[in-house]
Every structure is written in structure tokens, then in C-alpha cells.
Amino acid sequence: IVSMAMNGVSEGESHSNPHINETCCAYNLLKLTKDLNCFNPDDARYMDYYERTLYNQIIGSLHPEHYQTTYQYAVGLNASKPWGNETPQSTCCGGTGSENHVKYQEATYFVSDNTLWVALYMPTTLHWEEKNITLQQECLWPAKSSTIKVTAGEARFAMKLRVPYWATDGFDVKLNGISIATHYQPCSYAVIPTRQWKENDIVEITMPFTKHIDYGPDKLPAEIASKDGHQLETAWVGTLMHGPFAMTATDITNWTEATLNIDSRLASITVVEPNGPQTGTTGNLYTLMQGGRTFQ
């Protein structure tokens, strides 16, 4: 279930645990997704998938303190990440693992003759050579808001900004301080029609993270849920999500402990905001609290 929620890929690769992800598979599917998006950039499902895989598996495959990456990315009860690949020659995931973490920005923008698509929200600078215009995007990662500013040049084009599938409440786009719409459809693109862009034009995007449950496509069989000796019935299971992030608790060891008593509005889940405006492995991190359990 967690594997599907984070868009993990693989099934028993290298005769290992059958429910484990391979970093190289995610890497290759992101390349495919980026190319498919070029053929149909108005379909936000491609970049929703891309964002979720990038943020959960790819970024999660890098050791937070020193250079190590994952080959197989274990998820589930009592799982831990098998770090390795200190040199790129160790495995295929060592080579692609080195590449993964220097190209987060490569699918942020897409362009046609007269349209700019903003597909991801992260600190980046775009120089559109054909239009001779430069735009700078500023935000903290993970981004609940972002600002895009024209820093040099003038050009005429339309701008389309992705409304993530999880942005179901409070999403807004402002152009020079004025909202461009009163309603935004999740998993779509908000459109600023063709106009003359000039230096100091500013686009502000607000996208509060929303709590939701990403349910599996079928029920968890009772025989699997009861393997640890706790007798449970066949039931629907899902992953607790905060925006695009699959949240995990580090102290759950069996399916009984993983059972949460929540209502359909998720009102019992409390969001703990980050302590300070930081980007990195220890900053700008969100925590969810429910029934005495902590999810990060």
C-alpha cells in the first residue's frame, strides 16, 4: 500500500523481498513520464505522478547525512532503507542515484511556441532563449506557496500552472496581486491567457497541503494482516498523505498498531508546522499527529 502511495516500482527484483521498490525503476519511469508529458502537457496527471515519485522515492533514496543511495527501497511494517552505493560503480542504482539528485529541476518547465507550463514548484531560474526572457521561482521545499517573477526581458505568451491533485482546498494563483480565478480544478492547469510579460511581473501560487487517505485498489487479506499473531479481518487499507507526501510512523510494528480511528474529514489528525523557514534534510518538515502517534 505504501509502495503504491509513493509510486514505488518493482516486484521481487533480484529475488529479494517481493514487496520492495527499486530506485532505478522509478528513475526510468520519471524519464518516460517527462517525455509523455511533452506530447500532452495539458494533462496534469503526468506531472502529478512525477511529483509524487520524485518527492517520495527519488529524494527519499538519498541518505540525509552523507553520500549513500538506495538500490532497493523497502517499505511496510518494520522496514528500513538498505543504504549503499558509496561509489557510482556499486550497482545500477549507484549510477542513476548520482544523477537523480542533480536534476530535480529538469521537469519544472515545459514550453511550446507561445505557452509556458509550470509543472513543479521548486526554487529554479528559467531562461527562455527563444523569448529572451528570464523568470525566477522562489519557494521553500516542500512548497505550500511559490512566487514566480520576471527578472529580465519582455515577451508575449500564455502561462499554465499545475493545480496538484491534492490541492483541494485553498489553492490560488495571483498575477500582480489579483487572483486569476475563483475556482481551480485539482489535477489540471490554471491558465493565465496570452499577455505581454515584462520585468517585475509576479505570479504568486498558494497551495496548502491537504490531509487525505490514499486507499489501495483492493482489501488487505486477513491472512496477511494476521501474520504477526494479531487476528484481524480482511479490510480496506490506505496510506496517510499530506499533500504529495506519504507519511510514515516509525514506531508501528504490526497491523493492529497501524489501525487508526479517524472520521471521513480526518479532523482528528493534527498538523505540526515546521519550526523555521529552512530547506534541507532537517528543515521545513511537517508532522502529523493522531491518537498519540507521530507521522513524518
Task: Give the ranges of each region predicted by the language model.
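Surface-exposed beta-strand/loop patches in extracellular or lumenal glycoproteins
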Residues: K149, A155-Y165
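C-terminal beta-rich recognition modules with glycine/proline-rich loops and embedded aromatic residues
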Residues: M47-N56, S61-K149, Q185, T206-Q296
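Structural helix-adjacent loops and short alpha-helical linkers that scaffold large soluble proteins
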Residues: L36-D48
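Solvent-exposed beta-strand/loop surfaces of large extracellular or lumenal domains
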Residues: T168-P193, I213-P221
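C-terminal beta-strand-rich structural cap/linker in extracellular carbohydrate-active enzymes
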Residues: F157-K160, I192-T210
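Solvent-exposed loop and edge beta-strand segments that line ligand/cofactor-binding
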Residues: I1-Y27, G84-T96
